[in-house]
């Protein structure tokens, strides 16, 4: 029997890999091998999927992804619905797996560092490609700051973006006016496929730092990074370094 993965899990893995998760990229490579499941997975697990654990957090929902799989002996003569191809997907035939356990089931992968696992857990919770662009107009600042434009979900209840004190219209307008019209700053804005804001950061270009009294250094500075998902912070930093 070949490794069987649901369309939702494939989608989440694909987007997580596009968003920089090394683990998601590695798992996708294993999934695409099209080999018997026992060559890839430890134990008797197969028919992998995901489910979302939702927690209300005020104006947004915290989403935590739990992996699910079937580990029943589908060929056993006493297995209910033995000849039903949908049987592996019935809730009573499935078990929940934490992300770390799911990763460890892959024979040919790992070990991974804790920060790689944390990145994977965060990235897998957003089923979307993240796009980051640099803007400089007052309207761009306003859109990035207004709470109504934020993603409705986060990977944690303490989302720095959703808890920003500048998310209200009056404060957002004042901040946008200051940064765009007086300070001359720019803003990196991260959005999902639905154009929801999932992160932002102020960019100060061509500032002068002093290495010593007589040694000025021209530099750019990334400031005030806010995100709905932890991995987005790393994407913003990477984008800033490459810009």
Predicted regions and their residues:
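Non-catalytic substrate-recognition and accessory regions of acyl/acetyltransferase enzymes
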Residues: 1-243
